[in-house]
Amino acid sequence: MLGSSRVSKRRPLGAVAALMVVGLTLAGCAGGAPAQNADQGSADSGNITWWGWTPDATPAEAYIKAFNKVYPNIKVTFKKLTIDGYDAAIRPALASSVGPDVFAVAPGAANGSVDIYGVNAVDLKPAVEKTLGADWESKLAPIGVSSLMNGDKLAALSVGSVFSGTIWVNKDLFDKYGLTPPKTYDEWKKVCETFKANNVGCFVQGAAQTAFNEDTLQAITDNVAPGVWEKALKGEVPWTDPAIVQALTIWKKLFDDGIMQEGALGMQQYPDANNGFMSGKYAMVMMGTWYMQYSTIEGNTAAISGAGVADPKPFTQLPIPFPDVAGTGNVGALYGDADFGLAVNQKSKNIAAATTFATWLGTSAEGQQVVADVLNDIPALITTQPNWDTVKLVNPEVQRPALEKLISDSGKSTEPRLATVVADLQTAIGVASTTVAAGEATPEQAAATLQASAAKIK
């Protein structure tokens, strides 16, 4: 029955891609949208390339394997680039005639910005409407639709969303030294003192990769005064607001009190902090829901191996709320965006097959179930949940309740992460984080400089 249901859903998606191609060709002839390649290819066969900085190899292979059970004649080749190298690679590729057929874009001003590269993408609204019906927007997570628009064009289909605000802990290390994950600032300091006394790193952050500093600063600010960070992003309160100054002060204390590791300002979150945590050298790391994938035996083993460990042995990792560092009791805040979207290159010679792949992974029940079960993203199709009976966790009894709660809490969050942060503001926030940490500016001075930069962005 499983195979039959997959085959029965294959033709409608192919038909969607074919119908979309006709519409795109007409639009190009009418002079509305940029003209598409005359040869759009088949919706059910062909060789397509997919570029992205995410997902990791294991999720990507799972997505493609499941897709090929439904579309065996479409070969998908995934090319993973580094986060910092993605823009430099994708920009000339899209300008050429030999770029990828499918490419990743993301909300906001970070790598793969949909605002920048969405102009190179096919409008996927006709394909989604044919697949899900006229009420398609009600079936997909709103944050994944609104944040991947480029003007009036749906430039990409969200595979799923990610949320930050959590710290991930190596439970095995905590258990080994009789420790409990910290809930307050003082507890965090004491935990770090114990780990250091046993020659184990406590908390690790790649503070040189400043987009991830935003996650930590947003968590601290939400702890100080919920909602102020989001209001500052919208320009509703100045960046000199007392809550943000206090957050920068606490940020500095993390460095001064030894919670943040030595040399943090010279480390990247990827690969440095990630590898430090996965190799067992550090017990805690600031990461979001995308880290759920490493809760599985396969995902954890692959990540440990990728961190350079020769004989990887899975460990129990758990998400915990960001500690109550301000002593306010305001804990558990989560903020997120679409993780990434699959965009179809307007210059592709395989637009139909590429659209079939993007539409299947982002909107079909089968595709979204694979996304849910891999635990890399929280699915875009709102009716989809992980099938826990088939998800092989390292320590199901402990991890499953924590992951279920994280997924549930994420679904209730409306606070954005990076989607509303323009490039100049992201740079200014990064400068504030590093100058305060290095002692080159006081929290008050950094907040004033940040506000001055924000005031110029209109």
Model-identified regions with their sequence ranges:
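Short, low-complexity disordered leader/linker segments with a strong preference
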Residues: 1-48, 69, 176, 445-448, ...
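Short, well-ordered beta-strand elements
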Residues: 43-55, 74-79, 102, 155, ...
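Extracytoplasmic/periplasmic substrate-binding proteins
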Residues: 53, 250-350
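Extracytoplasmic "Venus flytrap"/periplasmic binding protein-like
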Residues: 66-140, 176-183, 283-284, 302
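Hinge/lid segment of periplasmic solute-binding proteins
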Residues: 110-164, 216, 312-320
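Short, solvent-exposed loop/beta-turn-alpha elements that line the ligand-binding surface or hinge
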Residues: 123-140, 224-246, 300, 305-313, ...
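C-terminal capping/gating helix-and-loop segments adjacent to ligand/active sites or protein-protein/ligand interfaces
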Residues: 158, 232, 380-385, 395-453
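Glycine-centered hinge/linker elements that transmit conformational signals in sensory
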Residues: 194-195, 234-265
